[in-house]
Every structure is written in C-alpha cells, then in structure tokens.
Amino acid sequence: MKGMQTTSNVGRKFNEDGSVRFFPGNTIISKVLEDNEIYSVIAGISKEFQAADQGRSYQFLPLASLHMTIIQGVCHEDRKKQLWSRYLPLDLELEKVDEFFEEKFKEVKSLPETRMIYDYIDMSNKNILVRFVPENQQAAENLKKYRDDVSDKLGVRFPDHDSYGFHISVAYQLWEMTEAEKEKMQKACERISRSLEKNRPSFSLRQPE
C-alpha cells in the first residue's frame, strides 16, 4: 500500500503491491481441502479477520492453498548448511534438489491416521497463524516418527526440528499498522479465540506430499 511502511514479509514472499513473489523451494505439506472438517473453521477465521483488517495491512491466503507444513524442505534463498540437505552441495540447482527429494520421498513410510487439535491463534510474528498440536500421545509419536523418517531420507534437519510448531497460515502482514488498527485486530483475535477455545476443533491430517 503506497506510502505505508512495509514489514519484513515484503521482499521475501510478497511484493509491495501484495502480489506473491517468486520464492522457489520445496516442503512436505498436508493439504487442507474442502472436505476436511477444519476447512470451514479456517475459512471462518479468515473471513472474520478480513472484516477487521479491511484490506489495510494483511494479505490473506486463498482458501485453495490451505495446508499444514509437516516438515520444512529447502528454498533457493536460504542456501545455508543448517537449512540444506546434508547429502547435497549448497550450490546445486534447485531442479536437481527437487529430483533428488522426489526419489527419496518415495522411501518414506506413510503417516498413520493422525489428528491435530486447536491450540491458539498466533499473531506474534507479522503473520496470522492458527496453531495446532497433536490430539494425543499417539498422534505426537506418529508425527515424530514421520518427521524423523523424512529428515533421514532427505537429509534435512532444521535447528527447530524437535520443537517445530504446527500451524495453518491464514495471512501475512505486509504493512505496519497504526495503534488503532492494532487494537482492532487484537480485539478480533480475542473474540475469535474465545469461540475456538469453547470447542477446540480438531481434524485428521491428509497424507503428506
């Protein structure tokens, strides 16, 4: 938005006009499709926040792109040893990395039935994220084994591997807010959070890809 101070999300994943910036990379995700029980919940959250923001500060993600990252892959702009496959050179073309990952991913065992449950809404880092945690101990074990298997096969183990926070992204903040705008969004967050905390929605993860 011309004349307004941008956030760190501009120049990385987004352009200043709100359009998506070319950001090549790969990651393992579980898609959230319309037939998933959590889809309508996330759609409702997005709609309420959009009403509060009124197109001022956030770029809301299209519902067709909803997903939960299961384990991070690599991206072209972050060619650092700790964020790259230990099996591959840092200067390898991303297309070659993709080919390697696609072949190795075939060796990963399927994720068993695993349910996630609502935890909280996180607006702390210039984003709107809906945080989830495994619904029970078995779900937590399923995810740990799966992530460790993917990590071993692809050679990727980020510094936060054992503490990664599962979430579904709703929006990215592109422009800084006034104090009045911050207060309005905070009130919307509190209102939405109260509603979600009453029933703590849960859902089954679609097989990662």
Show where each model-derived region lies:
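Histidine-dependent nucleotide/RNA phosphoesterase domain, centered on the 2H-phosphoesterase fold
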Residues: 1-209
